[in-house]
Structure formats: C-alpha cells, structure tokens
C-alpha cells in the first residue's frame, strides 16, 4: 500500500524531528 508507506514514513519523520528538537535543547 503506497499511501500507507508514505504515511508511515511521514510519521517516522515527525518522530525524528521531535527527537532532534529535544537533543538541540539539551
């Protein structure tokens, strides 16, 4: 399912962005 793959990748990107912001704050 292409749409599901894109959605999953987008969610993973969001998680990585949040983690990156957290590490920047440290």
Swiss-Prot record:
Tissue expression as described in the entry:
Hemolymph.
Which keywords belong to this entry?
A: Copper, Oxygen transport, Secreted, Transport
- Per the record, GO CC terms? extracellular region
Q: Which domain of life is it from?
A: Eukaryota
A GO molecular-function annotation:
oxygen carrier activity
Coiled coil located at which positions? none
Compartments (UniProt record): Secreted, Extracellular space
State the family it belongs to.
Answer: Belongs to the tyrosinase family. Hemocyanin subfamily.
The protein's role, per its UniProt record? Hemocyanins are copper-containing oxygen carriers occurring freely dissolved in the hemolymph of many mollusks and arthropods.
What name does UniProt use for this protein? Hemocyanin subunit 5
Species of origin: Maja squinado (Mediterranean spider crab)
The organism's taxonomy opens as:
Eukaryota, Metazoa, Ecdysozoa, Arthropoda, Crustacea
